Amino acid sequence: MRSYLGELDAVPYHPGPALPRIPRVLAALRRPMIELARECADGMLSYLVTPAHTAMARAVLGPDRLLCAEQAVLLSADPAEARRIARERTSWYFDLGNYPPSLRAQGFTDADLAGEGSDRIIDGLVAWGGVDAIAGRVREHLAAGADHVCIQPLPTGGDVFALQALRELAPALL
């Protein structure tokens, strides 16, 4: 990846005087990529992480780099329904490439990753409940060092873009 970034830097690109330099933000989950983001980028974007991961990333990244954390959210006060929907949207990551090592590094176990995931991993990765509970999780990421929290509302029912959830969450998050 370091070599690839060097190749990108070697390509002449002149966006003009209004934008003399385009910022670079890397997707990063584990320490080596976070260190690369610190050394060769303006920041990082994490995905499928807990606030504890955000705190670790901030410690590695340092104070002067952008840290954007993703947080899946689901407006549902029913634990069984919330976890069912969350599992539908997240469990496939538990067997996908670099996510299992990242999740293990965050403290989740093979038992948490088994099947469609334990309640512990689902609750750790998806903020569900009412507006206050979800806003609380977003605040946890901010307190852990995130500059920005990218919420990913999980769709329910016929609202495939989760627009209603965004409408309800916006006043508490903006």
Where do the language-model regions lie?
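Active-site-adjacent structural elements that line small-molecule/cofactor binding pockets in enzymes
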Residues: 1-174
